[in-house]
Every structure is written in structure tokens, then in C-alpha cells.
Regions:
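Extreme N-terminal leader/targeting segments of oxidoreductases
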Residues: 1-18, 33-36
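Short hydrophobic core segments
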Residues: 20-21, 205-215
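Glycine-rich Rossmann-fold phosphate-binding loop(s) that bind the pyrophosphate
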Residues: 23-24, 28, 46
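Glycine-rich FAD pyrophosphate-binding loop
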Residues: 35-56
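Dinucleotide-binding Rossmann-like beta1-alpha1 core, especially the glycine-rich loop
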Residues: 59-142
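Helical element adjacent to the flavin cofactor pocket in flavoenzyme catalytic cores
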Residues: 155-194, 198-208
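C-terminal catalytic lobe of FAD-dependent flavoproteins
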Residues: 174, 230-243, 247-273, 279-401, ...
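Flavin (primarily FAD) binding-site architecture
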Residues: 212-227
């Protein structure tokens, strides 16, 4: 029987402990934690797993230097703890340490002594060795495109980067490996009665608890339970631009624009990721446009600290879920809001990629789940990274790429290529992804379309527009 058909039948027949609505990083993290606690779980998403915010972030796992400036020391401390856990235990193949430079220009918003003090405090909270000021010559060795004109010095500190979509998928895989029903293209249709619309049919679901982790759609789901529910959040649009470059960078760049906003230049997947914008968004979360004005803003802000920016290869936009309130989105607190509706459905709004594990554990607490272990668990592929017996011959760059995306599960990805060497051909020109990854995405990772494969399960989309499998 087809795996998807089997999952739909199980959704209709099993009596569940928990239905998780939303397959972004928070929903996937909740499903992972709940299955580890022994719960019978179903995870559904109306689109694809990591189909929205969770594949459209700045790709950073970080303490949040700007949150220290806003006085949110608790959030910074918690985020740094989670960064270390993700790097060292949960997903060391996906979450990797990266130095960051914070340039100090003559006309910049901060004085060097202020930044140096902040970096020392930040690095102390991070338990990191890198902190303090470096001269222009060393900074230019780390970031060759750094604009030297007017540059007084750079602060140096440490954070981490990731592939956000694959981190989300690893959590989905962990939940599925423990028996969770996982279905993308499955939308919550009703709360009372509890029904899910999937493949043109409406399936009645029996679940003792429901958690709404629908990200930008969290209030839409709340209104299915209570049409009079007041808004719990607001949305902020973040646009990123991917350009050529970054392959010779040994550090990322944090560019201050005023005393609230920064933007980033991050060497990522062989490219350079620039961004992000932060503007209030009141449109349809299903279609978040990237305008020429958005792209121009990102490039202009990057040019404050970079010279010779390469050609644009891709753009994308995502939505941050922020607590409701007054004031600009850039200064809004990145906190998580939990609410419980009249039928007992718990809704989770907001949060950070870095702290998704903490949010998941807190959500289970709000659901009344007791005895949940807070000990971090390695995700699938996170162990045995130094003991991989590669089943086929590959160059070192391709091995490194697969090891990053899949960890030790790269062996599973490559196994069919033992009998079919054509699977070792490039998936698209100019990227290290292989045809074997396309097959694996469709047979093991719930990919239902070319976009699912190219955009969220591989890095093939970085080859440019018009790419098809």
C-alpha cells in the first residue's frame, strides 16, 4: 500500500493522544518531543513541511546580539544554551559554528567601547572563546569583500548557521520514526468536530489534545475553534537575497543600521545570503511577494559594509510571527505566546528557530503532558558522523555536502546508486546535489512536487529560476 494512503487511513482510524497542526519547526519540534514522551501523534500541514517561515529564515542559530541591546538577557542566555545543544548533540551535522564580524564605521550608530563591552557580555553568555575587537587587516582576511572606507575596527564573536528546512525535516523524520502519522497537504477543516481535509476528502480525527502551531496561519486556525477569537499576533515580512560569493569568507557579517536593526551577510551553501528586511505585513500569508523595492533595500543595506556585491541568484520572503502590540516590528520582542481556546486547543504564536526545542517542551506543558524529558536527543543522522562507510565513490565536496544535509543518513540516500549509477548525476547544473537526493526526497521525506525537492530538501533551487527535476 502507498505510504500516503496508509497514513490517511491511520489518521482516520487511530485514537490519538495529540494532533499537531502545522509542520514548521515549532510543530515538528512538538511532534518530536511528544513522540519521545510516548504519545501517539499525528502531524499535519496544509502545504509542505517547512513550507513557509521555517525555510525562509536568515539560517542563523544564534543568541541574538540585538536582543542584548534591547535588554532581553534571559532570551539571549536561553538561545545560547540551545545553540550549544543543537551544535553538539541534537544536529551537529546541520548546525555549525561560525565567527561573525560586527564592523564599526566612522558614521555608525555605536562607539567601539560600547560594542566591545556588549560582545564580551554576549560571549560570556555564549561560553564562547571569540570576543573583542580586531583590526581592519584581520577583518579583511575573514571577509575579503568588507568595505574598508571609514572602517575603524570590527568586533568578533561567535554564533552558528544551519539549513532551516532540513532541520525541520529532521524533526519530522524523528517523529515518524517513533510512529507518528505525518501528512503534508493536509489542512485542518474543523475543530468541532475535529476534521482534516486531505487529497479532496474530509477525514474525521479522534485526538485527546490539539495544538495549533500553524505559524502565520495561527489566528486562522484559532478562528476555526472560535470565530470571535481576537488576533493574538502580527506579521513581519523578512526578505533575503542570495548572491554569488561567500566561498572565500571565513566569517559572517552583522551590519548595524541603527540602534535597533541589523542585517546579515552569511556565507551559506556556497553562496552569500543577504538580509533581512523587517516590515509589517497585513496581506495573505499564502502569497508573500518580493518587490524590487525589497531587493533594493537589502542590497543597499549590504553595501554599507560590502564592496563588489555579486549578481543576484535568488530571492525569498518569509513571515515572522510577533506578539500583538503597538510600535514597529523591528523593536518587537521575539517571544512566544500560548493561548488555550474554549475546546482546549492550545495555540502557539511566535518564537525563534534557535529555541524551537524549548518552545516545544513548553507547549507540551500547556497541553498538560507530564513527565516529559528535557534531555536533548540526537536527531536522525546526527550520530556516527565520523564512521560513515560510503557505499559509492564521491569527490570530497559532494561528500561534505551530503554529510551536512543528511548526516549519517547519507548512506541511505546513496544506497540505490549502488545499482543505478545514474543517480550520482547532478540533480541540476551548478549545484552539488545528486539525482539520488530527488529519489530519497520522494520515497523517504514526503516530497510531493518538484518544488518540495528543490526548495526544501536539497539546495538545487540556488541554481536559479526555472529549474525543474
Amino acid at each position: 500500500m502507498d505510504e500516503r494512503v496508509r497514513a490517511i487511513e491511520q489518521l482516520a482510524s487511530r485514537e490519538l493522544d495529540l494532533l499537531v497542526v502545522g509542520g514548521g519547526i515549532v510543530g515538528a519540534g512538538i511532534a518530536e518531543a511528544a513522540t519521545a514522551a510516548g504519545l501517539d501523534v499525528a502531524l499535519v500541514d496544509k502545504g509542505d513541511f517547512a513550507g513557509a517561515t521555517s525555510s525562509a529564515s536568515s539560517k542563523l542559530v544564534h543568541g541574538g546580539l540585538r536582543y542584548l541591546r534591547l535588554g532581553d538577557v534571559g532570551l539571549v542566555r536561553e538561545a545560547h544554551h540551545e545553540r550549544r545543544v543543537l551544535m553538539n548533540i541534537v544536529a551537529p551535522h546541520l548546525v555549525r559554528r561560525l565567527p561573525f564580524l560586527f564592523p564599526l564605521y566612522d558614521n555608525g550608530p555605536y562607539r567601539p567601547w560600547f560594542v566591545q563591552t556588549g560582545i564580551v557580555v554576549y560571549s560570556t553568555l555564549a561560553r564562547a572563546r571569540l570576543n573583542g575587537l580586531v583590526d581592519v587587516e584581520r577583518a579583511r582576511r575573514l571577509v575579503p569583500q568588507l568595505q574598508p572606507r571609514g572602517l575603524r575596527a570590527c568586533a568578533l564573536y561567535e554564533d552558528a548557521w544551519t539549513n532551516d528546512g532540513r532541520l525541520t525535516l529532521a524533526n519530522v523524520r524523528a517523529a515518524a520514526d517513533r510512529g507518528a502519522i505525518v501528512l503534508n497537504g493536509a489542512e485542518l477543516a474543523s475543530v468541532q468536530p475535529l476534521e482534516v481535509r486531505v487529497d479532496g476528502n474530509v477525514v474525521r480525527v479522534r485526538a485527546r489534545r490539539v495544538v495549533n502551531a500553524a505559524g502565520p496561519w495561527v489566528d486562522h486556525v484559532r478562528r476555526l475553534e472560535d470565530p470571535a477569537a481576537r488576533p493574538s499576533m502580527r506579521l513581519s515580512k523578512g526578505v533575503h537575497v542570495v548572491v554569488d560569493g561567500g566561498d572565500h569568507w571565513s566569517a559572517a557579517l552583522t551590519i548595524p543600521h541603527d540602534k535597533v536593526r541589523v542585517s546579515f551577510g552569511v556565507p551559506w551553501e556556497g553562496m552569500l545570503l543577504l538580509g533581512t528586511t523587517d516590515t509589517e505585513y497585513t496581506g495573505d500569508p499564502d502569497t508573500v511577494p518580493v518587490s524590487d523595492t525589497d531587493v533594493r533595500q537589502v542590497l543597499d543595506e549590504a553595501a554599507v559594509a560590502l564592496e563588489d556585491i555579486g549578481p543576484v541568484r535568488a530571492t525569498f520572503a518569509g513571515l515572522r510571527v510577533l506578539p500583538g502590540g503597538e510600535g514597529g516590528t523591528a523593536s518587537a520582542r521575539r517571544e512566544t505566546v500560548f493561548s488555550t481556546g474554549p475546546t482546549g486547543m492550545v495555540s502557539v504564536a511566535g518564537g525563534k528557530l534557535t529555541t524551537y526545542r524549548r518552545i516545544a517542551l513548553d507547549a507540551l506543558g500547556h497541553l498538560g503532558v507530564r513527565g516529559v524529558s528535557r534531555r536533548p536527543r540526537p536527531l536522525p543522522g546526527a550520530t556516527g558522523l565520523d564512521r560513515i562507510d560510503w557505499p559509492v565513490e564521491l569527490d570530497s565536496a559532494t561528500r561534505a555536502h551530503l554529510l551536512h544535509l543528511y548526516g549519517s543518513l547519507a548512506i541511505e540516500v546513496l544506497q540505490p546508486a549502488v545499482d543505478d549509477p545514474s543517480l550520482l548525476e547532478p540533480l541540476v547544473p551548478g549545484r552539488p546535489d545528486l539525482r539520488a537526493q530527488d529519489l530519497y526526497a520522494r520515497t523517504h521525506e514526503w516530497a510531493r512536487s518538484d518544488e518540495d525537492v528543490l526548495r526544501r530538501r536539497t539546495t538545487a533551487w540556488l541554481a536559479g529560476a526555472g529549474i525543474r527535476v
